[in-house]
């Protein structure tokens, strides 16, 4: 096990993604390095009021603690209470144009240790897409890129982690999906350290190709106040999910994490409406009927 190699990879991944987004947007990220009193620190990179992105945050963190909160692992309750290290890169990009989808990506590593015992470690991560106005071409491209990232490790991983993603990014109180999914994995160590780390790298390295071609296709589509209004309404679902269900948010708050970094995923403008329903047959209604339904995009588009 080599946490230093993971640390170096994650820092490099953050830098590569920041540079790629700056090329598309034309505006620079603010870099905010921070330290955590209990141990560790990180760098939060934030782009606000950009040309393409209204708010884009990508954070690297490496935090250390003496007692692991239970929220850190559903599958490894025996790790609770051990000393621990957690490191990861997490991003959420909220575009200005409603025809460009919001995206989330995260890759992370946990290790929990106790003197005289074997360390308990695992990787987690994934990426998922949240369109406001859906395009089948974009959904297929995103899912195909996710599949290709994990295929070298076994054909079973894409369908397994697509289902994990669909199940995880689901708002139970709304009975609806947050978006069109992607892949999601957690508590992952079944390939041994080196191959599990390679799996994580493959997912992280796939992000730019999964998302930026979609941004380039959609960022110049004309839109009106109607589309912006629906975008703000749907962003409300993003806020609800992150504050109620998201394990990273809950873990960060339980472990006395840095609030500004934990909440960098929040959209800048959000609206709620009482019992609103889209007009039948409208492009807004099509999002619900045709896109956020857990479709098997790659079986449909072989």
From Swiss-Prot:
It holds the Pfam family Coprogen_oxidas. Its cofactor is a divalent metal cation. Its EC number is 1.3.3.3. A divalent metal cation binds at residues 94, 104, 143, 173. It is an enzyme of class 1 (oxidoreductase). One of its GO terms (biological process) is protoporphyrinogen IX biosynthetic process. It catalyses: coproporphyrinogen III + O2 + 2 H(+) = protoporphyrinogen IX + 2 CO2 + 2 H2O. The record marks 173 as: Important for dimerization. SUPFAM superfamilies: Coproporphyrinogen III oxidase. Pathway: Porphyrin-containing compound metabolism; protoporphyrin-IX biosynthesis; protoporphyrinogen-IX from coproporphyrinogen-III (O2 route): step 1/1. Substrate binds at residues 90, 106-108. Homodimer. Involved in the heme biosynthesis. Catalyzes the aerobic oxidative decarboxylation of propionate groups of rings A and B of coproporphyrinogen-III to yield the vinyl groups in protoporphyrinogen-IX. This is Oxygen-dependent coproporphyrinogen-III oxidase. It comes from Methylobacillus flagellatus (strain ATCC 51484 / DSM 6875 / VKM B-1610 / KT).
